[in-house]
């Protein structure tokens, strides 16, 4: 019998499926699921609590209420399994079948399924080519629709009102057929001939020219084809049978006092059954039409409410005035089935408690309270007690544990040993929010946490709580130990920098012990080694900071990896020598004590007086940055184990010496500079002066405000500078009797200087002045707070302060929610991005160059290419073919050094965006796994890691939109370029002419001036505006600080390209121009009138300046046959007279430029969200659609017609541009495709369309990085690239070729590529397409997997679309697999999935049998059960 049961269990296994298909259910299908028809609205008998027969909880239909017991009690026990009771008709089986057996309701009149009717675009409407309004009028019995026109002049699906219908009846009798209600729609849907329609529509598409018609036809065509391919029939969108959910999924629970708690679904079903039964009765009675009609409409409404309450009309409410929860509400939203139960499950074996510091723990340990451990590990303890024979049964073991006998604790110790537990702190923003530790038992009730992992958890000990989870199975323990142990997560997956970095006390302790103090006790000693230094210090003979000579033995790593000892005397301090004791072998001493770089004079002094060696001791102490670098170097050189031990040792040492340092903060530590009074008095005087100027009308209110704020901002700077100088330096006499300067030992200064806590800005508020405050709207209050916290604030100052503080709190709350939502969208778009193969073999890639803004290198090349794979051989600069790095090599630290030594400044690297893998990404295109430091493994979920890396720092980004102005970002209008580096000038995309002084005048808009060093590396780059005058030539050498270019920032010149005499055309005084004379200088100038200021005679005229030679003939622009003529736009100013002579490079006219004004720059989180959502900016830059020559056509009201004539003689391109846009181009100028014509924020869509994939990737990556860099957050570019790849997943079909795609359709690129490969192999025409950029929300919703999309947002819409198209979900991504309850196809599950797929394929090949379908399995099971029943009888 047991074997049979096992066999049965094996039979019902349905895990073996490869994909899930969703479709429309036909009435027959619904009947086949059902175990009987629900005929009555009754639920259960309120006295006996037994379900009513034929009701919503009927036991005959849905199964027994108690295990193996029929309702009337005739058959009980297991032996009657499978018997159907003659009396009550209930099958004797397990009660859990009530969770899976469905019923059905036969509807007396067909009803439309609201999802296919109302979910836009209405599927029924599309198929019938009727508007939703019309269909609703038919469905809700307001008008008739013609179904069969017969021999009349009516059309099929024509609407008829009541009167029209009666007239038609009189005229034609029963020649035609017209109905109302769902029956009519059902008949229309049945009559559709899909194949015929598809044929006619494809022909229509080929013939039509109108865009709107094309779009509409394409939509219909896609829908029809979906129906054809999926095997759905259109009439199934109208329901004639309604399925009934199994009763245990809509429970009814008796409460005490004779009341019941029930699921809303029961109410909705009751309503449907009541109306349906009433309708049946009315139809039997042949009631009047109007009554039947009303009943049918009510039935339709109740079915609507059951499926999706509130979708149409007012939602049906329950007794508590709340809308009832319908079937659709059950699955959608945060509380729906997908997000609440399938994606987020609660787990057993977990506990939570407050955390405290565990300064004595090792990095892989955590302290677990005994009580907690005992509870969590109970099953293991029971097992151990039994196997040891200490307890005979589980029950006895349980008693022992409850009594907490002594032996139980010993066993708990054994059980816990080497059994890791997971610690998690909410919110888990990235994968380091859950890590594994080995528990050690502690007294008390709080969990102890190692201080170094706090950064990863973002935890502090002010009452944070953490949860503990126990991995149960051996595999889970193994994964926890090998992958999640805190010692295996030293590097951050976001940037590849160490995340196990000491902070606060530890940093302060290490900083304190590595400081040097002048004339400390024991200065000038000579010691035999670090051990002796420690002895001397412990004995109190020398101070920790004393400058001494110590014999240090370093172990240096050789080329072959072996260690070589090297001993020498070092001038250092006692503390640094002691610290060197914990330095791992193989790391040089210079890492903790950088030798001081001596000037020539100091070196000479030292040679002359050797006793002055004290002065050569470096005065640099270990700060936070240096410690981080120390750990990073250790990881790269020494590997994981040494780093972990070293980090722990650093922590213990740091805590120890921080305690000994006795650093504390007293009020006297906040030293207020003496100069403060004078500085503030001077600022007040300046402000008073400006106020006077304002009152006498010399400056405007706006200028006054800005100047006042400038004055106070600079005063604040001066005060804080004075204060820091005062705080940070002190002078002392050394042992040689000379005075030396040293860094101060002021506690506050040490904390800030070491990076332990606080910053210069905070010290400024304590001891300088608080400075300017902002109002909640972001504008700056012009009276600053001149007091600091040491002096104390008065009431007014305190009140001003609260403004900013309150805004900060409100911002933070909003920010957290926004940031979480951004992370959720990112995870959703990238969740199926997994490394699926080793190398896709592509030669494509992105060009990487150092990021340079003005004169500063923001990000050097090495940081951008470290950990990437080279796409092409890197050639040594200056040679033709000497290969430095071969293609497909992973660039590690050594290779990056090699590139730097050879001054390479562009490298083509492989990128996720250019990867050719169909699904997922390949390891070579991704490069290094940042958290592990080697090439990424197959199965790594790089998409989720990317999303977490971008989302996790989201809460640190600001929410503000920055106003330019105030002290936020004051940049005076630039008017010249001063170079910061020495090097040679190089001009890029320059067009220029030489003027009369033989200086270059720039005549193009995209000119860049770069400074190259002698190795040919770019040091800085500047944009040169049109009309700037260069002081230098291309290729000339310049020195740092030289001014190389000048221009007038307030006007925009028009530059001549040839010499000649001026000739004015259409320049008529009072019509197109007006003359103005400057009162001060007496010079007159001509100002061109704007079109709308001219009289009607001058509207069409175009004022022009022509250049003519002495004979009055037009002068041509060299190398072209275009006459040199310059059209003058409105407001242009001409300072020359008609007939004046001009040279090359002179300005014939100037156009005044309004200064930028206060445009808001969107910053922070909103900016990142805008970029990833690929939103169109408000006024985007206008880019040239084709390459060619610019000219202007006829103007219209408010718009200019811009014409580009292509150089290769193709079609002319025209665009209407609003007049107020500042154009960057003039008539006759040549532009390249994708060049900026009118300034503004560039739109990512335009960049992709006109410049291609690589530029759009660079644009998004750089813009996102700008936001993060401002906050000092480091994120690797490749994470952003992974997201961009997902945004570029879709393409638009341009021509279909021999595929069955439709032009203009949006399809996954991978699909098209696969189809094209097949076509090319068969020698047919492939489809052509162009990439499109989708925002992350849209991309998530349009993924191939409908399960993933439905669990993200807009569940109804996604499921409706998927059902109509009969979509199949291949379960490729992570989300789908979590939802169906499988291992995810990433990480350790990657191999499992591949094995499974291969196994199934092999099995199918071996047997050659088709897979068993679900129905067959069901049948087999039924046969077996019946057979089982017959065994028992014997």
Swiss-Prot record:
Binding site for Zn(2+) 1: 70, 72, 85, 88
Binding site for Zn(2+) 2: 840, 915, 922, 925
Key word Magnesium present: yes
GO biological process, one term: DNA-templated transcription
Gene3D superfamilies in UniProt: 1.10.132.30, 1.10.150.390, 1.10.1790.20, 1.10.40.90, 2.40.40.20, 2.40.50.100, RNA polymerase II, clamp domain (4.10.860.120), RNA polymerase Rpb1, domain 3 (1.10.274.100)
Residues reported in the UniProt entry to bind Mg(2+): 460, 462, 464
Record EC number: 2.7.7.6
A GO molecular-function descriptor: DNA binding
Gene Ontology cellular component list: DNA-directed RNA polymerase complex
EC primary class: transferase
Keyword list, A-Z: DNA-directed RNA polymerase, Magnesium, Metal-binding, Nucleotidyltransferase, Transcription, Transferase, Zinc
Source species, domain of life: Bacteria
SUPFAM superfamilies linked: beta and beta-prime subunits of DNA dependent RNA-polymerase
Entry cofactors: Mg(2+); Zn(2+)
Cofactor note: Binds 1 Mg(2+) ion per subunit. Binds 2 Zn(2+) ions per subunit.
Keyword Signal in annotation: no
The reaction(s) this protein catalyses: RNA(n) + a ribonucleoside 5'-triphosphate = RNA(n+1) + diphosphate
Cited PANTHER family: DNA-DIRECTED RNA POLYMERASE (PTHR19376), DNA-DIRECTED RNA POLYMERASE SUBUNIT BETA (PTHR19376:SF54)
Family recorded in the similarity comment: Belongs to the RNA polymerase beta' chain family.
Function field: DNA-dependent RNA polymerase catalyzes the transcription of DNA into RNA using the four ribonucleoside triphosphates as substrates.
Quaternary structure (record): The RNAP catalytic core consists of 2 alpha, 1 beta, 1 beta' and 1 omega subunit. When a sigma factor is associated with the core the holoenzyme is formed, which can initiate transcription.
Stored NCBIfam families: rpoC_TIGR (TIGR02386)
Protein name: DNA-directed RNA polymerase subunit beta'
Natural source organism: Aeromonas hydrophila subsp. hydrophila (strain ATCC 7966 / DSM 30187 / BCRC 13018 / CCUG 14551 / JCM 1027 / KCTC 2358 / NCIMB 9240 / NCTC 8049)
Gene encoding the protein: rpoC
């Amino acid at each position: 019998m047991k074997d049979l049961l096992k066999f049965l269990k094996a039979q019902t296994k349905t895990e073996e499926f490869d994909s899930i298909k969703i479709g429309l259910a036909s009435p027959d299908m619904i009947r086949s699921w059902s175990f009987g028809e629900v005929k009555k609205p009754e639920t259960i008998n309120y006295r006996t609590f037994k379900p009513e027969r034929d009701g919503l909880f009927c036991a005959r239909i849905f199964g027994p209420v108690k295990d193996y017991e029929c309702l009337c009690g005739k058959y009980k026990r297991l032996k009657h399994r499978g018997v159907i009771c003659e009396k009550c008709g209930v099958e004797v089986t397990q009660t859990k079948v009530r969770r899976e057996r469905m019923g059905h309701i036969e509807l007396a009149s067909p009803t439309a399924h609201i999802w296919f009717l109302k979910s836009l675009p209405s599927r029924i409407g599309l198929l019938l080519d009727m508007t939703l309004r019309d269909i609703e009028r038919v469905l809700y019995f307001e008008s008739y629709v013609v179904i069969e026109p017969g021999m009349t002049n009516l059309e099929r699906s024509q609407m008829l009102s009541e009167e029209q219908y009666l007239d038609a009846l009189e005229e034609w009798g029963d020649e035609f057929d017209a109905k109302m209600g769902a029956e009519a729609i059902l008949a229309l849907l049945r009559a559709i001939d899909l194949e015929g329609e598809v044929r006619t529509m494809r022909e229509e598409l080929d013939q039509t020219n109108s865009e709107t018609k094309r779009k509409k036809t394409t939509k219909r065509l896609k829908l029809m084809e979906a129906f054809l391919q999926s095997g759905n029939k259109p009439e199934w969108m109208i329901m004639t049978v309604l399925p009934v959910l199994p009763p245990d999924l809509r429970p009814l629970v008796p409460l005490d006092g004779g009341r019941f708690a029930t699921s809303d679904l029961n109410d909705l079903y009751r309503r449907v059954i009541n109306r349906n039964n009433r309708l049946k009765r009315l139809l039997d009675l042949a009631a009047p039409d109007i009554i039947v009609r009303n009943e049918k409409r009510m039935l339709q409404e109740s079915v609507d409410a059951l499926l999706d309450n509130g979708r149409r009309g007012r939602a049906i409410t329950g007794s508590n005035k709340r809308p009832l929860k319908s079937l659709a509400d059950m699955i959608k939203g945060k509380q729906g089935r997908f997000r609440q139960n399938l994606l987020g499950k609660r787990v057993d074996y977990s506990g939570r408690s407050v955390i405290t510091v565990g300064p004595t723990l090792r990095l892989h340990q955590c302290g677990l309270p005994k009580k907690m451990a005992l509870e969590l590990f109970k099953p293991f303890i029971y097992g151990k007690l039994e196997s040891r024979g200490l307890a005979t049964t589980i029950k006895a073991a349980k008693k022992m544990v409850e009594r907490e006998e002594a032996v139980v604790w010993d066993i708990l110790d054994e059980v816990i040993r080497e059994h890791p537990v997971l610690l998690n702190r909410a919110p888990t923003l990235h994968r380091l929010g859950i890590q594994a530790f080995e528990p050690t038992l502690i007294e008390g009730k709080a969990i102890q946490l190692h201080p170094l992992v706090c950064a990863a958890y973002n935890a502090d000990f002010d009452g944070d709580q953490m949860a503990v989870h126990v991995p149960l199975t051996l595999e889970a323990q193994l994964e926890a130990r090998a992958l999640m142990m805190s010692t295996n997560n030293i590097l951050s997956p976001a940037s590849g920098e160490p995340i196990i970095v000491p902070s606060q006390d530890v940093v302060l302790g290490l900083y304190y012990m590595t400081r040097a103090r002048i004339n400390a006790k024991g200065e000038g000693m000579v010691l035999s080694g670090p051990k002796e230094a420690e002895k001397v210090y412990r004995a109190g003979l020398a101070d920790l900071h004393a400058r001494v000579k110590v014999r240090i033995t370093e172990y240096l790593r050789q080329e072959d990896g072996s260690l070589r000892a090297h001993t020498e005397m070092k001038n250092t301090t006692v503390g640094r020598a002691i610290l060197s004791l914990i330095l791992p072998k193989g790391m040089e001493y210079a890492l903790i004590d950088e030798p001081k770089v001596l000037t020539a004079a100091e070196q000479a002094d030292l040679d002359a007086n050797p006793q002055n060696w004290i002065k050569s001791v470096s005065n640099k102490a270990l700060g936070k940055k240096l410690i981080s670098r120390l750990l990073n170097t250790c990881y790269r050189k020494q590997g994981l184990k040494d780093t972990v031990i070293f980090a722990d040792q650093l922590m213990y040492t740091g805590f120890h010496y921080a305690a000994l340092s006795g650093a504390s903060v007293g009020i006297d530590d906040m030293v207020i500079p003496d100069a403060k009074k004078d500085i503030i008095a001077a600022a007040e005087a300046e402000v008073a002066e400006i106020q006077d100027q304002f009152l006498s009308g010399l400056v405007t209110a706006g200028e006054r405000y800005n100047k006042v704020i400038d004055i106070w901002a600079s005063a604040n700077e001066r005060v804080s500078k004075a204060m820091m100088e005062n705080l940070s330096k002190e002078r002392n006499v050394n042992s040689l009797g000379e005075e030396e300067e040293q860094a101060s030992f002021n506690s506050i200064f040490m904390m800030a200087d070491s990076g332990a806590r606080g910053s210069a800005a905070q010290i400024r508020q304590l001891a300088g002045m608080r400075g300017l405050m902002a109002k909640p709207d972001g504008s700056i209050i012009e009276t600053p707070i001149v007091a600091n916290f040491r002096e104390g604030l008065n009431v007014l100052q305190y009140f001003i302060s609260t403004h900013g503080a309150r805004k900060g709190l409100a911002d933070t709350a909003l920010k957290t929610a926004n940031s979480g939502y951004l992370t959720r969208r990112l995870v959703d778009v990238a969740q199926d991005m997994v490394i699926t193969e080793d190398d896709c073999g592509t030669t494509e890639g992105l060009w990487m160059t150092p990021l340079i803004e003005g004169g500063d290198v923001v990000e050097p090349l090495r940081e951008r290419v470290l950990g990437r794979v080279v796409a092409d051989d890197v050639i040594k600069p200056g040679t033709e073919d000497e290969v430095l790095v071969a293609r497909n090599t992973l660039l590690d630290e050594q290779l990056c050094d090699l590139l730097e030594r050879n001054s390479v400044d562009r490298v083509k690297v492989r990128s996720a965006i250019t990867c050719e893998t169909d699904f997922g990404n390949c390891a070579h295109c991704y490069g290094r796994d940042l958290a592990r430091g080697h090439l990424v493994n197959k199965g790594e979920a790089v998409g989720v890691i990317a999303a977490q890396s971008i989302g996790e720092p989201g809460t640190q980004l600001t929410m503000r939109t920055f106003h330019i102005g105030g002290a936020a970002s004051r940049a005076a209008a630039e008017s010249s370029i001063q170079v910061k580096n020495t090097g040679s000038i190089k001009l890029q995309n320059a067009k220029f002419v030489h003027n009369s002084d033989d200086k270059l005048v720039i005549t193009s808009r995209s000119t860049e001036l770069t400074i190259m060093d002698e190795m040919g590396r770019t040091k800085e780059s500047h944009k040169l505006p049109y009309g700037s005058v260069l002081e230098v030539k291309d290729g000339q050498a310049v020195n740092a600080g030289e001014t190389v270019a000048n221009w007038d920032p307030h006007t925009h010149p028009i530059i001549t390209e040839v010499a000649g005499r001026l000739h004015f055309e259409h320049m008529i005084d009072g019509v197109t121009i007006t003359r103005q004379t400057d009162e001060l200088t007496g010079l007159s100038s001509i100002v061109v009138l704007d079109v709308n200021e001219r009289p009607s005679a001058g509207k069409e005229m175009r004022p022009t300046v022509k250049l003519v030679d002495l004979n009055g003939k037009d002068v041509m622009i060299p190398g072209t046959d275009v006459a040199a003529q310059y059209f003058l736009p409105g407001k242009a100013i001409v300072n020359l007279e008609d007939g004046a002579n001009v040279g090359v490079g002179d300005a014939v006219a100037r156009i005044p430029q309004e200064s930028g004004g206060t445009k808001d720059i969107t910053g922070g989180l909103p900016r990142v969200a805008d970029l990833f959502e690929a939103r169109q900016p408000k006024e985007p830059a206008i880019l040239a659609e084709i390459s060619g020559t610019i000219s202007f056509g006829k103007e219209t009201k408010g718009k200019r017609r811009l014409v580009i004539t292509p150089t290769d003689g193709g079609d002319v391109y025209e665009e209407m541009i609003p007049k107020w846009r500042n154009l960057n181009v003039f008539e006759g100028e040549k532009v390249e495709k994708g060049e900026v014509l009118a300034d503004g924020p560039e739109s990512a869509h335009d960049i992709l369309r006109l410049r291609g994939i690589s530029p759009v990737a660079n644009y998004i990556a750089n813009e996102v990085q700008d936001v993060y860099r401002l906050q000092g957050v480091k994120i690797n570019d490749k994470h952003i690239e992974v997201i961009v790849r997902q945004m570029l997943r879709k393409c638009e079909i341009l021509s279909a070729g021999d595929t069955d795609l439709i032009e203009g359709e949006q399809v996954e690129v991978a699909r098209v590529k696969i189809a094209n490969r097949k076509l090319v192999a068969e020698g047919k025409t492939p489809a052509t397409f162009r990439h499109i950029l989708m925002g992350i929300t849209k991309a998530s919703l349009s993924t191939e997997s409908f399960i993933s999309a439905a669990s993200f947002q807009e569940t109804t819409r996604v499921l409706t679309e998927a059902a109509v198209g009969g979509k199949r979900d291949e379960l490729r991504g992570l989300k789908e697999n979590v939802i169906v309850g499988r291992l995810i196809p990433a990480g350790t599950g990657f191999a499992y999935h591949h094995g499974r797929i291969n196994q199934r394929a092999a099995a199918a090949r071996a047997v050659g049998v088709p897979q068993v379908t679900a129905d067959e399995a069901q049948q087999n099971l039924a046969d077996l059960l019946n057979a089982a029943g017959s065994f028992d009888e014997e």
